[in-house]
Structure formats: structure tokens, C-alpha cells
Amino acid sequence: MGQEKHVFTIDWAGRQLTVETGQLAKQANGAVLVRYGDTAVLSSATASKEPKPLDFFPLTVNYEERLYAVGKIPGGFIKREGRPSEKAILASRLIDRPIRPLFADGFRNEVQVISIVMSVDQDCSSEMAAMFGSSLALCVSDIPFEGPIAGVTVGRVDGKFIINPNVEQLEQSDINLVVAGTKDAINMVEAGADEVPEETMLEAIMYGHQEIKRLIEFQEEIVKAVGKAKIDIPLYEVDQTLADEVKALAETDLLKAIQVHEKHAREDAISAVKKAVVEKFEEEDRDEATIKQAKDVLNKLVKNEVRRLITEEKVRPDGRGVDQIRPLSSEVGLLPRTHGSGLFTRGQTQALSICTLGALGDVQILDGLGVEESKRFMHHYNFPQFSVGETGPMRGPGRREIGHGALGERALEPVIPSEKDFPYTVRLVSEVLESNGSTSQASICASTLAMMDAGVPIKAPVAGIAMGLVKSGEYYTVLTDIQGMEDALGDMDFKVAGTSKGVTALQMDIKIDGLSKDILEEALQQAKKGRMEILDSMLSTIPTSRGELSRYAPKILTMKINPDKIRDVIGPSGKQINKIIEDTGVKIDIEQDGTIFISSTEEDMNQKAKKIIEDLVREVEVGQLYLGKVKRIEKFGAFLEIFSGKDGLVHISELALDRVGKVEDVVKIGDELLVKVTEIDKQGRVNLSRKAVLREEKEKEEKQS
């Protein structure tokens, strides 16, 4: 590629897409600067010169956010970017998934693909620019890669599909779909939707693929102009003589072990066969490299037989039919002090979800490159080692946990009631207690149960199911409700979540080059059938959301005031609102339109805070009577508090019907007097009269007599 700068441009979805090569990051194997509108992303691809001694392909994909891209300085003391945001982690996964299947089997050189977001135009997706740049950086490099791939975002407004919708269009869209693929097929799908039918989702996917083809043609033109020749990297291969020897030793016993239906018994049986082969080789003083290859042959034998049984005999490892769901059970209300809890079990996969309700002030504040500043609905996913019967370090959430949590959040968000109808922050935590595949979808089902148990008035229950695929040449089998072994040894993990009305979330990962429309259609329809069965099971446990919230959940009281009076409630430097919070123990959130949310676990404290606020914003009216308390006495009169925060003066001449010599002769501090407002002067000072009230009472008595 040399040192010369090259620039390539096309129009993409009504905006200019420009690629620059040859100027930046020239020591990487491949690097491109992608400009999409005012968004700019630098993508680079680098590979190690030697293969790593690993039994997997060491690919790392990073999407790096820089706050300077949106003109921000990071908060905190350090003033530099720290750990990646949730959005950055999800974007890294989004780019990794369509790229990973396009490296050859046996590729063991470490590959690192890094996209640095340098400028952000909110209407021009930095994630799509980074995906395009990551593919192109690999393609123009000398790293062997069977791309290119590209991705687009598809929205739908008023029934019409839109490629790469802007922020305003996305807010109106009932679909937010990211689809990626090669020129010939789709290999990654990620979507959120507002209960959209399967047929429409399939249309959106295929609509996006047409635009992907254009982007791939553009990449091919660039590669033809500036691409490097691919280097010859040796692939890891097993010695065929050794493979035949291991096969002769173990194949018969492995075939029997594979057909044991129970997970742990099957794993133990397979492990025993593998152990016998390894021990034989150790007795023969075979070297470590040979023993490692023997283990790889054994794993390949297991994989091939599981796949053969599924494609040729339609027999699954646990004996189910291809469209059969594992036994289902569910339960709610397990944890008495939580606001809501739901347990969902599907075979040997089990998730317990807990719903917690909070005030609107408990929203998550987002500090990133997007336009969204906060969110009031959160779903977090935890996967402890004991769920698979293993030990391991307890760390914070990794990419997988964050990805599964976000998928559940996307699936459930369309059914969360609006802030107006339900002024609460909602947090769901899903604890995976047992795992044999499809835990993310179990967490969606358990979370639905937890919200219904908590009394959240969701629009409809949501269930999720994971579909699998085993493909051999032109023949393929779509599997419903895949378990761990089918996920590990199969070709697809296609997660579909939704209500009885339609899809709310999709996520598809594959290990082959891509999928045809026919396979996608079959998988979606088979998933719909399974989802309906799961929903029926869940609704037999709890048919509708509970009619009232847990007594341990905060009670939220809503009131409305004149927006001009907000400053009176807050007070100088927040003094007034902090005093209300201190006196009552409530939480107070104030909207700009004057809507106030008061929350507490004690309803009487909510009412007390409401009364204080009402008094603070109350308008004094001339001619009205008020019961005031004497707060201060001067020679010329008494100052009364007629309601919280509002004082008025009763002049000495207005204290009684007769002449008063000293104020103290009539009132003392703490006395309560019924007074009438006679005047509010230009400075807002309130003049009161006790004499006027006494005169009216006297006249009334005289009339009655």
C-alpha cells in the first residue's frame, strides 16, 4: 500500500461515506480512516507473526470510545477514559460476531482489530462505520481473511424501511435492526422491536442485505486498488495417521457415550473415553504435542457424531425431537422482602430474576458518546460458576454478561409502561442458577415473571427461546430450545424473544459463512411456535400482573405545580428541598414542567411532604381568611406565618376592634389567630387584619340576634 494517501467515496443512505488509507497507522497490517457524515473512525488490523500454542482462534475486537469525539472531558479526578462503557462493549461484540466466522479453521495467529471513534455525528452511526472499517482494515491488510463483510441499521417508520435512520427516525421506528453479512448471505443479526411480526422482521433483514451488497462492492474496489497480497499462514492440522489411530481406539465407545441423555452422565461417559486414550498414550511415552493432538481428534469425533445424529437421524443428545422444548416450570414470590421475584426453569437451565422499583431519581446516568443521558429501565445478568458445577474466580461482569443483560433489556423494554403511567425506575437482576444452554432467554422469562409479581403493569408478557442449526452441505436441521452441547457443536445460536403479538428482540450468531432466507424464515416460525408454548406455561403460574405493589416498594405520589414556583420548592442552593427531604425522609424528583414525584415506603410521609410543597407554592389571595401563627412581635405589630414559608404583618391598629396600647397585651409568640388578607403591596409584602375578622363576626352575631 506504500505511504501514499488514497481517498474513496460513495453515497450511503443519503450521506457521504469516505475511506482514507495510506496516511494513518501505517505500521499496522491494515488501517483505514472511515468518515461517515461527520463521524470519523480509525480501524486497524494487526496479526502476530507466529501462531499461538492455543486450541482456539485468538481474535480480539475492540471498539474504543474517546469522549473528545463529542467535545467532552471525562469526569472524575483522573480526567481520562477508564474501563469501556456498556455501549462500547456491546459495539465490540457486534463487530466481532460477523468477522469471526470468516477466518479459516486452524488459524492460530493472534489477530487484533481496533476501532477508535474520533468524531461523532449522532445521525451517522459510529458502530456501523466501525464495522465497515474493521472489515476493510482486514481486507486491505496481508492477514488471510475471507471477507469482506458489512453491516447496516434498518428502521421502519410508517411502514417503510429506512437504512441507517437518524436519531429522530429511530425514536419513531418500531424496529431497530442491525444486520451484517457477506455478499451472498447474512451472518449476524441484532434487533429490538415493538412486537413486530416475524414476517416483517424477515423482510427487514433481507432489505438490509441488499444495502450490504453495495458496501461490499465498495470494499472490493478499495481492496483491488490498495490491498496487500495475503501472506501464507500455516494452519493448525492434526496428523492423519494419528487421527486414524485415535479413531480406531475410541470411536465405538464415544458413539455410545454421546447417546447418554442426561447432561452430567453424558459428560462423564465422554470424559472416561478420552481419559482412557490419554492414559494409553502416556504409558507409551508419547510427547505432549501428540497427546494434545489426540485430544483434538477426540473432540472432533464427538462433534462429528453429534452433528451426524442430528442431520441424518434427527436425534438430539438428550433424545428430544428437533422442535421439542425441555420441561418447563416457573414460580413467583420466592423472596419475601424483594419487590418481585420470578424463577424460570427449562430442563437444566434455571434463572431467578428479582425486580426492584425505585424513584425516578434512581435512573442510570449515561456518560458516553450517545444522545441518551439516562435510562429508567435496567436488566443485569449474572452467571456464577456454580451454575455449571464448576469453581472459578468471582469477577465483575464480562463481555458475555453485559451482552446477555443488554439482550434481555432490549427484549423487555417495549412492554415497560411509560413514565407517565408508571413513574418508577425499574431494575431487574437475573441470577443464572443452572446452565445447560439458553440462559439469556431464561433470564427474559424469569424477568417477566418478576415484574408481574412486583405489580409492574407491563403491556404484555415476554418469553425468549434459542434456536440452533446443524448444516451439512445442502442439508440442514433447525433445532428448537438448544442446550449447551448443541450450541457448542452446532452452527447457529439464534435467540428470539417476544410477546404473543410479535418479536421484541433478535440476536443471531453463526459459525458458518452465512444463512439463506429460507433457513431464517424456518427458524423464526419454529421459534414463534416455541415461544407461544413457553408463554402458556408462564401464564399458568401468574396470569396477569399483581393489582398492587409490594408493601416494601416505594409509594410514589405525583403532584403538579406552576413551573415558575419550582425555585420556591428548591430554595437557595437547594436549602428548602433538602429540608423537606430531611424532615420527611422522602425522595423528591422535579420535572421542568412542574410535575413533582414524591416517593417513600410510608404513604403518610408522602402526604406530609406534599402538604409542605403545597404551602410553599400556595398563592396568598386578598380577601381570604387564614389561620396564622405568631412568629415575631414588634412595637408596630405582629408577624404571622399563615402557611409554610409565607409571613404577613398584622399592624397594631388591626389587632383588635378597640385601640391597642402594646402588641403584647393582645398576642404572644405561638398564638394562632384567624386573620384576613387586606393587601399585597408592590414588593409582595402581605398585610393582614384581625380586626376585619372580628368585625365580620360581630356583624354576623348582631344579625342573628
Swiss-Prot record:
Belongs to the polyribonucleotide nucleotidyltransferase family. GO terms for cellular component: cytosol. GO terms for biological process: mRNA catabolic process; RNA processing. Mg(2+) binds at D487, D493. The lineage of its organism: Bacteria, Bacillati, Bacillota, Bacilli, Bacillales. It catalyses: RNA(n+1) + phosphate = RNA(n) + a ribonucleoside 5'-diphosphate. The keyword Plastid does not apply. This is Polyribonucleotide nucleotidyltransferase. It is found in: Cytoplasm. Its cofactor is Mg(2+). Its EC number is 2.7.7.8. Its main location: cytoplasm. It is an enzyme of class 2 (transferase). Keywords: Cytoplasm, Magnesium, Metal-binding, Nucleotidyltransferase, RNA-binding, Transferase. Involved in mRNA degradation. Catalyzes the phosphorolysis of single-stranded polyribonucleotides processively in the 3'- to 5'-direction. Residues 554-613 form the KH domain.
